[in-house]
């Protein structure tokens, strides 16, 4: 769902503002970033370091309490998803509700109905933990080879062992957690327009 939000809004508006309201000093902000780098999500870091204090579901509700009105319908993206006529799924380290809220504003939620797995479904083991993607592939019978195109905005997530044989695509963005030099070898393609990328795939299939 991060990828979908980036199609229509600045990354900082996604989750940064709610977290900043609680991170009232620099130390808290530094801890937040440290946990993200070390544990793949801030929530995962909190759960590992303060298992008796953190309410994971309340945390998800809080950080996803954002203004979705900044998102707009993406008619082109919807059209290409429909015309491509392939199975599509969403794997998110956030909540399913957040992903659905984003998709509703963009106008593609019906195309992913029943095809979303979130951090709760992953037993709070965030991507790139291979257990998460393996769980999703097993549930939806997704091929773990070049038949599957795996698109991510966080290039680290493409390094998952579960995706090693998939076609891996990075949606270009300036998220500070992206270390492109470190993960460049796991990226097969880079894109900055999802609808255009899907259109190119469709045209290749039609040849």
Cite the ranges covered by each PLM segment:
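Charged, low-complexity surface patches
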Residues: 35-36, 73, 92, 150
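A metal-dependent, Asp-based hydrolase signature
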Residues: 5, 9-65
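Short, solvent-exposed polar/charged micro-motifs at secondary-structure junctions
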Residues: 37-41, 70, 199-203
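Asp-based phosphoryl-transfer active-site loop
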Residues: 1-2
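Short, acidic loop-to-helix structural element flanking the phosphoryl-transfer center
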Residues: 40-90, 96-100, 130
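Asp-based, Mg2+/Mn2+-dependent phosphohydrolase catalytic module
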Residues: 82, 89, 95-96, 100-207
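Conserved short-loop catalytic and cofactor-binding motifs
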Residues: 30-34, 65-68, 87, 120-124
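Glycine-centered loop/turn motif at secondary-structure junctions
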Residues: 12-18, 50-51, 85, 107, ...
């Amino acid at each position: 769902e991060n990828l979908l939000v980036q199609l229509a809004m600045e990354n900082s508006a996604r989750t940064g503002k709610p977290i900043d309201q609680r991170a009232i000093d620099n130390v808290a902000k530094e801890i937040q970033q440290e946990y993200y780098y070390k544990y793949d999500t801030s929530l995962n870091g909190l759960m590992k370091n303060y298992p008796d204090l953190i309410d994971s579901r309340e945390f998800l509700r809080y950080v996803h309490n954002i203004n979705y009105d900044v998102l707009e319908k993406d008619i082109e993206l919807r059209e290409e998803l429909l015309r491509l006529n392939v199975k599509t799924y969403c794997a998110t380290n956030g909540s399913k509700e957040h992903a659905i809220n984003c998709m509703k504003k963009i106008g593609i939620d019906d195309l992913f109905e029943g095809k979303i797995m979130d951090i709760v479904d992953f037993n709070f083991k965030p991507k790139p933990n291979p257990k998460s993607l393996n769980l999703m592939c097993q549930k939806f019978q997704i091929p773990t080879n070049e038949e599957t195109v795996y698109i991510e905005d966080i290039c680290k997530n493409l390094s998952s062992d579960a995706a090693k044989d998939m076609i891996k695509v990075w949606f270009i963005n300036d998220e500070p957690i992206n270390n492109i030099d470190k993960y460049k070898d796991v990226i097969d393609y880079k894109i900055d327009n999802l609808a255009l990328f899907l259109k190119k795939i469709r045209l290749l299939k039609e040849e």
